[in-house]
């Protein structure tokens, strides 16, 4: 009987944690969706972008969502690869300071444009607009998630 009590407690704890995870993920995706909808409206208003894919809600969600997910994957992969290079080559001048951030930003933007953006024919945004958007996001990442020491390393 005691075994069943602990099993129920573990199951209840798992369900609560899963509920919190799903709820926070849903809230994040909702805010992301509203933010991207607002960004697309701003780009359309200033004639900086054109979004001509207009099917059903789920088709639009899949098309534009995959654009965002693939773009995020490219930027994420470039950042981690550049961090890996910086750790492997600490004396190299290209992997220090502003030069490192400029190279990371340019590589991520260029790869995003040629690998992701050119394959989505219904999204028409100029390269310089993509550079400004990714540059703004990169500066926000540097501001809100600065490089810091690994606090888990104990000497």
UniProtKB/Swiss-Prot annotation:
The chain crosses the membrane at residues 15-35, 61-81, 98-118, 120-140. Pfam families: SepA. GO terms for cellular component: plasma membrane. It is found in: Cell membrane. It comes from the Bacteria. It is a multi-pass membrane protein. Keywords: Cell membrane, Membrane, Transmembrane, Transmembrane helix, Transport. Involved in multidrug efflux. Belongs to the multidrug resistance efflux pump SepA family. This is Multidrug resistance efflux pump SepA. It comes from Staphylococcus aureus (strain MRSA252). The lineage of its organism: Bacteria, Bacillati, Bacillota, Bacilli, Bacillales.
